[in-house]
């Protein structure tokens, strides 16, 4: 079995029984189960949700995206070995830690395979919940050019690149393109303020005005739980993105939960603690891959300029990245996962065949 065979690059073609189109994201694909299969699993597996809750199989891939494009490597390598399993393992660990600390639930009901979650359908909040503890990345670039107000928050003068911020900052942006909201352009990833959310809370998916306080509390509390755990293994939790949504519990009440992934190298910046104390930045996240791309291609503006998206897409499509660069990302992701979870990350030789076998034999979901 070759290295390329061990990578799950295409994850939207599994023969899972569904009566809806498969939703394919940059990294994950979602298979909505039939009503009959959802009800059967809720009953036979004992999931603690209402019996009419729609369920889905969420399958992660090993694809690597950056700057809104999917990249690939030499030798037919269409993804990063171990990346999908590492991301899921990290999220699973943090969700468990959240539960132990009395925070909200997640959308995950079952974990049949390292690449697979069984999730309940949620009503998503249309906000990318971003939390920052250090000034770096896009915030630093804007600050260095004179900007001081970010998402309605004024930063002090005299901050330096990569330094710790005086307070943990919440800098939300829009999730998807939202129309008809005063003062908010109909574009993806537009920075918004808490005032924007309060004035239009229902348009952003909040059911109650006071849930804005709850979302901010869950964001900050989740950040602090992960930050403390990472500090224990000498890693710095720099910034991250969470997602939230509502589900209905067995008593018919709405509750706010964590969605998607949390605290991973894809959704966060994580720095090596020893290097940071020495005045250096050693990325243990996707940011290292982004920096590689900016240095690898002769015209980095293609990757940064949104007006050059067709060129960027062609660049990603037509260039095989060096194998060593892809394997460095693999080492970063699996290394962080092993530090966080304290366990080796399984790398199945043929993940697709394994997934099909488990979903057939243990869940009866394969056509």
Curated annotation (Swiss-Prot):
One of its GO terms (biological process) is 'de novo' IMP biosynthetic process. Keywords: ATP-binding, Ligase, Nucleotide-binding, Purine biosynthesis. HAMAP family: SAICAR_synth (MF_00137). This is Phosphoribosylaminoimidazole-succinocarboxamide synthase. It comes from Shewanella sp. (strain W3-18-1). Its EC number is 6.3.2.6. It catalyses: 5-amino-1-(5-phospho-D-ribosyl)imidazole-4-carboxylate + L-aspartate + ATP = (2S)-2-[5-amino-1-(5-phospho-beta-D-ribosyl)imidazole-4-carboxamido]succinate + ADP + phosphate + 2 H(+). GO terms for cellular component: cytoplasm. It is an enzyme of class 6 (ligase). The keyword Membrane does not apply. Belongs to the SAICAR synthetase family. GO terms for molecular function: ATP binding; phosphoribosylaminoimidazolesuccinocarboxamide synthase activity. Pathway: Purine metabolism; IMP biosynthesis via de novo pathway; 5-amino-1-(5-phospho-D-ribosyl)imidazole-4-carboxamide from 5-amino-1-(5-phospho-D-ribosyl)imidazole-4-carboxylate: step 1/2.
């Amino acid at each position: 079995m070759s290295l390329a065979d061990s990578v799950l690059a295409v994850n939207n073609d599994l023969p899972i029984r569904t009566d809806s189109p498969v939703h394919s994201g940059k990294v994950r694909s979602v298979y909505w189960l039939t009503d009959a299969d959802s009800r059967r699993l809720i009953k036979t597996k004992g999931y603690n949700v209402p019996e009419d809750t729609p369920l889905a199989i969420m399958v992660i891939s090993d694809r690597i995206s950056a700057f809104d494009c999917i990249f690939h490597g030499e030798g037919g390598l269409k993804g990063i070995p171990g990346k999908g399993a590492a991301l899921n393992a990290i999220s699973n660990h943090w969700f468990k830690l959240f539960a132990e600390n009395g925070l909200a639930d997640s959308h995950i009901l079952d974990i049949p395979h390292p690449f697979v979650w069984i999730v309940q359908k949620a009503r998503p909040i249309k906000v990318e919940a971003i939390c920052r503890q250090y000034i770096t990345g896009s915030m630093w670039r804007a600050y260095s050019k004179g900007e001081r107000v970010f998402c309605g928050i004024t930063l002090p003068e005299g901050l330096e690149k990569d330094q710790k911020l005086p307070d943990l900052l919440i800098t939300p942006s829009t999730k998807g393109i939202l129309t008809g909201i005063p003062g908010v352009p109909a574009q993806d990833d537009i920075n918004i303020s808490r005032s924007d959310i309060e004035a239009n809370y229902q348009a952003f998916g909040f059911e109650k005005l006071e849930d804005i306080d709850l979302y901010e509390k869950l964001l900050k509390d989740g950040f602090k739980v992960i930050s403390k755990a990472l500090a224990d293994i000498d890693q710095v939790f720099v910034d991250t993105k969470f997602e939230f949504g509502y589900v209905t519990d067995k008593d018919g009440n709405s509750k706010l939960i964590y969605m998607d992934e949390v605290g991973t190298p894809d959704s966060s910046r994580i720095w090596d603690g020893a290097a940071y104390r020495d005045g250096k930045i050693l990325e243990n996240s996707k940011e290292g891959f982004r920096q590689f791309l900016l240095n690898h291609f002769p015209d980095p503006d293609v990757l940064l300029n949104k007006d050059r998206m067709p060129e960027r897409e062609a660049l990603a499509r037509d260039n095989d990245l060096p194998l060593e660069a892809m394997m460095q990302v693999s080492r970063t992701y699996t290394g962080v996962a092993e530090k966080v979870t304290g366990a080796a990350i399984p790398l199945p030789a043929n993940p697709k065949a394994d997934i099909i076998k488990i979903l057939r034999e243990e869940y009866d979901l394969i056509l």
